[in-house]
Amino acid sequence: MKQNFFAVDLGATSGRTILGSFIEGGLNLEEINRFPNHLIEVGGHFYWDIYALYRHIIDGLKLVAHRGESIASIGIDTWGVDFVLLGKDGNLLRQPYAYRDPHTVGAPEAFFSRISRSEVYGKTGIQVMNFNSLFQLDTLRRNHDSALEAADKVLFMPDALSYMLTGKMVTEYTIASTAQLVNAHTQRLEPELLKAVGLQEENFGRFVFPGEKIGTLTEEVQKITGLGAIPVIAVAGHDTGSAVAAVPALDRNFAYLSSGTWSLMGVETDAPVITAETEALNFTNEGGVEGTIRLLKNICGMWLLERCRLNWGDTSYPELITEADSCEPFRSLINPDDDCFANPADMEQAIREYCRTTGQPVPEQRGQIVRCIFESLALRYRQVLENLRALSPRPIETLHVIGGGSRNDLLNQFTANAIGIPVVAGPSEATAIGNVMIQAMTVGEATDVAGMRQLISRSIPLKTYHPQDMAAWDAAYIHFKNCVR
């Protein structure tokens, strides 16, 4: 009998629900509903509308129920670091802050005045970024935030949504690891860091790993959706964790690039790699499935283009890619990870101003802006990959690009040109596939991650890009390193 697995995949700009099932020869995915996920700006702060996300999930479940389809289980993954605060009565105390909120500017330095940067990194192996949950929580503590002071529980976004569906509070390992609150060696919440932000382990839900059952739909949700007591399974709650589980690699000599709003480049390791070098380069060790560690670097990704598109109306990606392809190469380059691109009011203007202040031609046409973004991303990927090669316990012979960005032929070719090794693109739905596969492993439909990857490689169309024009890209890389600030 065919089993359907309901995957909820929420990104920082959009979300969707997907029904996955196994068919002869592979995996079938059907999108049930897709919806925007917008920042809400109120009083100079940025929040997520978790109630809207919950409503969209309920809508997806109702659509499946209306068709008479059965669901074997449900899994939820989201972006990282953001969280919900619950009172003693189990109710949400307010909408969660979004990680792009400016209140964490300078937060790491404030925290390190009490516990040193090296000590924090030595425990967690997580790269230092302003918006890590550790620093968000410490910012709220220092600001005497009323919601934090009243909070009984802290739930990360995927865990908060599973709580709204099941009434059960959990803390899933991969999403907690990303938060910089988990000891990378013990794979448990780190008591010293919790104490530093005024919390204890009791302020979090039951600690679970991917593949564990969270609970079943509450009677209320069953009544609203018309479904039964369907189990909700902890997948890799951090979307990158689910995505990397779906990398269609047949050996381990690969790096991955999860390409979406963020670009996350890394390798899989069997143990944390926490050294003076990884600390200096600000690489992160995030928890993965089956006990693996994702040694990776966060790179700003399609956020740059997504924000530019806000000014460009309904222009499609193919149109923009065609315009970029016809523009002069290497005219202007930026550092995608410069702070000025974190959340500017006008991304186009921020890019132009960066080029102006670094003495480069200022992009005027839309195609020039897009080409600047793509070339700069590809060259930044090369820079990060060079560091990754020095840190990886295995050689890197292929780069697997997964996620929505894997559909971008021009950027994929630029990336192959820049890094000098083959780029294998796909699947674009890696996060949803990983989500479904982890659910399927729980009920025995799939055996292990290696078997999952073989199935994906056989059943999902992939495209390989080989390096071209390497001399020109080598020269551009020198220019890139000289002009980034």
From Swiss-Prot:
Catalytic site positions: 239
Keywords assigned: ATP-binding, Disulfide bond, Kinase, Magnesium, Nucleotide-binding, Rhamnose metabolism, Transferase
Alphabetical list of SUPFAM superfamilies matching this protein: Actin-like ATPase domain (SSF53067)
Top enzyme category: transferase
Catalysed reactions listed for this entry: L-rhamnulose + ATP = L-rhamnulose 1-phosphate + ADP + H(+)
Cofactor or coenzyme needed: Mg(2+)
GO molecular function: ATP binding; glycerol kinase activity; rhamnulokinase activity
Pathway(s): Carbohydrate degradation; L-rhamnose degradation; glycerone phosphate from L-rhamnose: step 2/3
EC number: 2.7.1.5
Superkingdom per UniProt: Bacteria
An annotated GO cellular component: cytosol
UniProt binding sites for ATP: 12-16, 261, 306, 404
Keyword match Transferase: yes
Family annotation (InterPro entries): ATPase_NBD, Carb_kinase_FGGY, FGGY_C, FGGY_N, Rhamnulokinase
Record GO biological process: rhamnose catabolic process
Disulfide partners: 355-372
Binding annotation for substrate: 80, 238-240, 298
Keyword Cell wall biogenesis/degradation included in the entry's annotation: no
Family as reported in the entry's similarity comment: Belongs to the rhamnulokinase family.
Function: Involved in the catabolism of L-rhamnose (6-deoxy-L-mannose). Catalyzes the transfer of the gamma-phosphate group from ATP to the 1-hydroxyl group of L-rhamnulose to yield L-rhamnulose 1-phosphate.
Protein name per its UniProtKB record: Rhamnulokinase
Organism of derivation: Bacteroides thetaiotaomicron (strain ATCC 29148 / DSM 2079 / JCM 5827 / CCUG 10774 / NCTC 10582 / VPI-5482 / E50)
Gene transcribed to yield this protein: rhaB
